[in-house]
From Swiss-Prot:
Protein name from the UniProt record: Maturase K
Main location: plastid
Family according to the record: Belongs to the intron maturase 2 family. MatK subfamily.
Keyword RNA-binding: yes
Taxonomy of the source species: Eukaryota, Viridiplantae, Streptophyta, Embryophyta, Tracheophyta
Gene name of this polypeptide: matK
InterPro entries membership: Domain_X, Maturase_MatK, Maturase_MatK_N
Record function comment: Usually encoded in the trnK tRNA gene intron. Probably assists in splicing its own and other chloroplast group II introns.
Pfam families for the chain: Intron_maturas2, MatK_N
GO annotations of cellular component type: chloroplast
One Gene Ontology molecular-function label: RNA binding
Amino acid sequence: MEEFQVYLELNRSRRHDFLYPLIFREYIYALAHDHGLNKSMIFLENQGYGNKFSSLIVKRLIIRMDQQNHLIISANDSNQNPFFGHKKNLYSQMISAGFAVIVEIPFSLRLVSYSQGEEVAKSHNLQSIHSIFPFLEDKFSHLNYVLDVLIPYPIHLEILVQALRYWVKDASSLHLLRFSLYEYCNLKSFITPKKSISIFNPRLFFFLYNSHACEYESIFLFLRNQSSHLRSTSSGVFLERIYFYGKIDYLVEVFSNDFQNNLWLFKDPFTHFIRYQGKAILASKDTSLLMNKWKYYFVDLWQYYFYMWSQSGRFRINQLSKYSLDFLGYLSSVRLNPSVVRSQMLENSFIIDNAMKKLDTRIPIISLIGSLSKAKFCNTLGHPISKPTWADSSDSDIIDRFVRICRNLSHYHSGSSKKKSLYRIKYILRFSCVKTLARKHKSTVRAFLKRLGSEFLEEFFTETEEEHFFSLIFPRVFFTSRKLYRGRIWYLDIICINALVNHE
C-alpha cells in the first residue's frame, strides 16, 4: 500500500475518482511490471519484441496516446486506426496491464484509509475465501441439500464495463476500457475459451469479472436475508455439542406451542453461499422444494437483470447424504456414522442406536489419475510409465521433480479424510520415477533397484516440512499412534493451486 501513496499523488483525482490521467504516467506501467515479476506478464513475453521490460516502449506508447486526438473509436474502424501501427498487439496489452493497476486504486485507497484508522463501510455478509474451511468442518455436516451452480459468463463485454460505473465514476477511463477491449478481442470468443482470456490481461479480466459477480451477489444476499422469517442470531456457540441439531428438531417438534417466542435461539435460518472462480454452491437445511425455488431465482436474476443466459442444466440439487459435492478438488459428502450404546438401568438394559453425521472429504482419484495420464506419468488405467522427456536430466533433478510433485499433491489433499487414494498417487509417481531412471541408464527396473537399492526413493514417504512442524507442537503420543496423519489438516494456500482445483 505504501507504493501507491508514494507514487500516486492523486490530489483532485483522489476526491473525484478521476483516474484517466494516470494512464499517461510511466510509474503505472512500472507497477504493472512489478506485479508480474513472479507471474508471466503478457507483454513481457511477447514474441518479436524481446522478453525484457523496456521503458522506451512505454514512453513511445504515452507519446502516441498524448498526441492522438481520436483515441476512442469504434471497433469496426480499428483496422484503419494509425494509433497502434505494427505494434498494435503489444501496445494494447500494455494498456490493459496498466489499466489493471489503475482500476484497483480506489479499492487500495480504501485499505490504506482503513489502516490509518478511518472508518470504512464493512459488509457483514461477505467473508474471506478462507472461511470455506471452517464452514466445511463446522456447518457442512449439519446441512441437507446443496445446489451446485456453474456461473454463466456475460454475453457482452459492455456488461463488464457497466459493472465498474458504481466504483469508477470517470467516463474517460470507462471509454478507454471499452477501446482496449474492442481493439483486439473478438466479442464471440473472448469470454468462454481459456485461450482467448490469455490474450487479455488476466489481472484486469478477473477484476472485471469479480466486480460483476459482486453486483448480483449483493442482490442475492438481500433476497436471502429477506427470506428468513426468524431472527438471524448465530448459533455458533452451540456447535460444540455433538447432538445439538438433533436436540433442535426435538425441541421444535415438542415445545413449539409453549415456547414460540424462544425458537429463534435454536433455529439456524441462514442459507450458506460460497463462490469460487466460475462455480458456486448454495447449501441449506431446507427441503428440495425450497432449493428448487432458489434455482429459479438464480435463473431469473441472471437473465432478466444481468442479461446472462443460464440453462437449468447448469444447476444440480443433491442430497448430501447420497451424493458427493465436487468442490475445491475434493469430493465432499455427509455420511452417517452409526454407533450402538448399551445403557444399564437397574435390572434392565437398553440398546440405543445413534447415527451421527460426519463430514467425508475424499480425493477424486479417477480425475486425478486422468490428469497424471495426460502428463504422461501413467496410462489411463493408472499403471506407472516412464517420463522420456525428463530422461536427459541428471538423476538428482529427476528425483527432485518427482518428489516435489508428490509433496505438492500431499500438501493439497491433506484435508482428505481417507488417505488410501493419496498412497496410490504416491505409488504411481514413485515407480514412474524409477522407470524414468531405468530408461535413462538403459536398464530394467528390477536390475536398477537391485543395484542401487530402494532406500534412495524413501523421500516420497519421508516426513514433510508441515509434518515436522506439527511434530514440534503436538504431543508425541499423537505421532506414535499416527492419529494426526489420519486427521484432516487444511492449508490456506491450496486455493491458489488452480491446476488441482480446475482438474476437470
